[in-house]
């Protein structure tokens, strides 16, 4: 994994990535945080998504969550990413990749897909967009 991340840093024209105390590597690309962490035989990419409209007080907006999950199912054949709620209830875009099958080019492709999906999802989570999609107008 170290060689993979070293090669990724080189190909992105960056200094070698350094893990934090929890072993998580943090990359900021196009103003988006992409966290990479080894998990057994996998490399997990995670990007938290700021989605205050997903919460209604202490509850989750089920209609919006259902819509987002349906979209995640639709892209599942083309993208390794899925949407998850973390332990704090925050929406996270996540991909799990087998380290044995991963090379630098493949990792870059997955990161690019992560960024593309973020650009697709984030506008849907603005107050106006959410209101029009779930009938809050």
From Swiss-Prot:
Keywords: Cell inner membrane, Cell membrane, Chaperone, Cytoplasm, Membrane, Plasmid
Compartments (UniProt record): Cytoplasm; Cell inner membrane
Any one Pfam family match given in the protein's UniProt record, by short name: CesT
GO CC aspect terms: cytoplasm; plasma membrane
Membrane topology according to the record: Peripheral membrane protein
Keyword Cytoplasm annotated: yes
InterPro entries membership: T3SS_YscB, Tir_chaperone
SUPFAM superfamilies per UniProt: Type III secretory system chaperone-like
Gene Ontology terms: biological process: protein secretion by the type III secretion system
Function as written in the Swiss-Prot or TrEMBL entry: Functions as a specific chaperone for YopN. It could facilitate the secretion and the subsequent translocation of YopN.
Quaternary structure annotation from Swiss-Prot or TrEMBL: Interacts with SycN to form a complex which specifically binds to YopN.
Protein name (Swiss-Prot/TrEMBL): Chaperone protein YscB
Native organism: Yersinia enterocolitica serotype O:8 / biotype 1B (strain NCTC 13174 / 8081)
This protein's encoding gene: yscB
